């Protein structure tokens, strides 16, 4: 799909700071330093591949080290290989040895640095000091990185030339000509509001909606669009100037769309499929989301697990023999809507006959029916009741998990 790459203009110190009266509205843009193998450093606003641009965007890969899988009973182990789509990205969830490989998902705001370790590998250094070795699994590994260097302008650095990417707070002396897309999305399950990534891709006012009309092909900047509504297999597009268009013939405007992502503060990130989507109404805003410093250092998950025999186990927890830190995510689905919820936002998980009831710290409740973290596909829970004592519970023996 054709995209505009010249979407950023950096303004160095001494220039006018757009929106300074509003604080620092551009704080949500990715910013950092790219060190190359030739020992050069480039510093500025970053776009990861052609998609991720903000601290709440996700870096996706596959975990190479699975320290908790050894507690899975022998009878539940096996060998499989499967390619699945996670929030618009193809993720290879191959089985390695006897254990299921697991997806790695972290917000860029939780990451200190990323160091390539080969064509398909990288070491991800997280706030708090932990390091995850990841291996392939999505186009976030091995992709080109665009950095808008403060002195040189736009630089496109191939993955194989990168030695290290170090993230840091976005300074107030940068000006970005594009706005971040935000608005309200109406679905069959209600309304979601927040920042929007259309087709799991377009997130800026300068990105374009591609489609065909009766009069020919069109490529419309999102900044000129007021709303998009599903009409069968087509889309009704209303422009800011009041005109209405019917578009078809591309994954931006028909059922082949890869999903509409909404960063809804109530839940985290939701992905809305075509069948659930009804309409999006965009709103103009200079807000770009949380700043890098707004993401605290993560910590281990702790809480209480009650089993079906009435016993209570308190301590450190690994959910699904995988997620054990607050930077990680709980995923589940219902009605063609996928939820990727930061574990720091989860208050409790209660397995049901079908899926789980998930209660969030903000008070929202979700009855999720699909997803490995919330269904009978889960590998269960591991609880460190003492530093040297661990208790494993299969998922069908878990009555409720309450997180501290």
What are the residue ranges of the model-derived segments?
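Positively charged n-region of N-terminal signal peptides that target proteins for export
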Residues: 1-5
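Bacterial N-terminal signal peptides
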Residues: 7-16
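Compositionally biased alpha-helical segments
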Residues: 22-404
């Amino acid at each position: 799909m054709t995209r505009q790459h010249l979407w950023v203009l950096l303004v160095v110190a001494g220039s006018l700071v757009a929106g300074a009266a509003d604080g620092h509205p551009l704080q949500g843009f990715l910013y950092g330093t790219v060190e190359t193998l030739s020992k050069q450093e480039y510093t500025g606003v970053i776009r990861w591949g052609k998609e991720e641009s903000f601290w709440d965007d996700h870096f996706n890969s596959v975990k190479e080290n699975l320290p908790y899988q050894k507690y899975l009973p022998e009878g539940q182990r096996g060998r499989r290989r499967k390619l699945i789509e996670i929030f618009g990205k193809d993720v290879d969830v191959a089985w390695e040895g006897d254990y299921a490989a697991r997806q790695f998902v972290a917000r860029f705001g939780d990451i200190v640095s990323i160091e390539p370790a080969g064509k398909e590998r990288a070491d991800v250094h997280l706030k708090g000091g932990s390091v995850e070795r990841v291996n392939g699994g999505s186009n976030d590994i091995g992709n080109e990185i665009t950095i808008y260097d403060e002195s040189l302008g736009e630089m496109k650095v191939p993955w194989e030339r990168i030695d290290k990417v170090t993230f840091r707070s976005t300074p107030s002396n940068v000006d970005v000509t594009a706005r971040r897309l935000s608005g309200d999305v109406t679905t069959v399950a209600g309304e979601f509001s927040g920042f929007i990534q259309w087709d799991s891709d377009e997130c800026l006012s300068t990105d374009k909606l591609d489609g065909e009309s009766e009069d020919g092909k069109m490529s419309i900047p999102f900044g000129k669009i007021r709303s998009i509504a599903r009409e069968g297999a087509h889309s009704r597009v209303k422009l800011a100037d009041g005109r209405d268009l019917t578009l078809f013939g591309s994954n931006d405007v028909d059922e082949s769309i890869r999903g509409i992502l909404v960063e809804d503060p109530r839940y985290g990130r939701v992905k809305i499929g075509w069948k659930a989507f009804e309409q999006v109404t965009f709103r103009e805003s200079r807000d770009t989301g949380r700043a890098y410093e707004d993401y605290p250092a993560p910590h281990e998950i702790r809480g209480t697990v009650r089993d079906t025999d009435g016993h209570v186990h308190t301590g450190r927890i690994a959910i699904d023999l995988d997620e054990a830190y607050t930077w990680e995510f709980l995923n589940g689905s219902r009605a063609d809507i996928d939820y990727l919820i930061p574990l720091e936002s989860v208050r409790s998980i209660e397995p049901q006959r079908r899926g789980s009831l998930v209660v969030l710290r903000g008070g929202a409740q979700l009855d999720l029916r699909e997803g490995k973290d919330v269904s009978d596909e889960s590998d269960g829970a591991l609880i460190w009741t003492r530093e040297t004592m661990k208790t494993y519970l299969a998922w069908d023996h878990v009555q409720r998990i309450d997180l501290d």
